[in-house]
């Protein structure tokens, strides 16, 4: 079993990386999330999380980011290959409880895994 940490090497941190994903990445969508994906030059899969102010106040935005990070941390082994992924929360995701957010992420990650190959 691998480490459950989420180190900086597995995070998208630079604005240029986010812009590259938004311009030329492929997208997968659910009702409450969008995933922008692109092959990575690094040797790991990196995750970025975007939750805009339209989603809610800081407490709600941080809750959504925390759940997304935790879900990725526990399920990153299901994603094969080296890619950059940006998970973008849609406006009404804050109306969901934690279980419903995880279920939506499960649907999104299934779409991401199906796009492997």
UniProtKB/Swiss-Prot annotation:
One BP term from GO: tRNA 5'-leader removal
GO cellular component terms listed in the entry, alphabetical order:
ribonuclease P complex
Instruction: Give the EC class as a word.
Output: hydrolase
Q: Catalytic activity annotated for this protein?
A: Endonucleolytic cleavage of RNA, removing 5'-extranucleotides from tRNA precursor
Q: What are its E.C. numbers? A: 3.1.26.5
- Identify a single GO molecular function assigned to this protein: ribonuclease P activity
What keywords were assigned to this record?
Answer: Endonuclease, Hydrolase, Nuclease, RNA-binding, tRNA processing
Q: Does the keyword Hydrolase belong to this entry?
A: yes
Matches recorded under NCBIfam families: rnpA (TIGR00188)
Q: What does this protein do?
A: RNaseP catalyzes the removal of the 5'-leader sequence from pre-tRNA to produce the mature 5'-terminus. It can also cleave other RNA substrates such as 4.5S RNA. The protein component plays an auxiliary but essential role in vivo by binding to the 5'-leader sequence and broadening the substrate specificity of the ribozyme.
| Oligomeric form and interacting partners | Consists of a catalytic RNA component (M1 or rnpB) and a protein subunit.
- Family, similarity comment: Belongs to the RnpA family.
Its recorded name reads Ribonuclease P protein component
- Native species of this protein? Desulforapulum autotrophicum (strain ATCC 43914 / DSM 3382 / VKM B-1955 / HRM2) (Desulfobacterium autotrophicum)
Lineage start: Bacteria, Pseudomonadati, Thermodesulfobacteriota, Desulfobacteria, Desulfobacterales
